[in-house]
Amino acid sequence: MYQKTGKIMIDGVEFYPDYTFEDFKKTPFYTNQDGIRIIPLNGAKEIDDHKYIVNLFFRDGKLYMISLACVDMDVPFEEEEKRALLHRQILDEYGLSDVNTFPWGTIKAIYDSRSNSSTIAFLYQ
C-alpha cells in the first residue's frame, strides 16, 4: 500500500486520489457496473502479503472509498472482532495507527458493531 500518496495497486491496476469512474471503465474489473452502487471486485485480491475482499465506492464520478476486508484467516461471523484486530495489526505493519490522515484523505481501520463487519478503508477527499 502506498499510504503517503494514496495509491494502491490491485491486480496490476493502480487506484489513486482523483481516480474516476471513467478510469475504472478502462480496467478489466469493469463489467458494466453503474458506478452508483458498491462495486465488489471478484475474488480475493492479493496486496503485498495479504488477501482481501475489495469493494469500491464512487461518489459523483470520483473514487470515494476502497474497502479492504482481509481474508487471511477464516473468521466466523460472531467473531468478526478478530478480523478487526487483524486489520489494526496490518496497519501497524505499515507504521500506521487506526486512523491516519494525509493530504489526499484517510486510511482507517473500521469496525461496525451494528453490522458486525470490519474493514481497512482508504477514504479519498
Could you say what each language-model-derived stretch is?
Residues 1-125:
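Short helix/turn-capping signatures at newly exposed starts of structured segments
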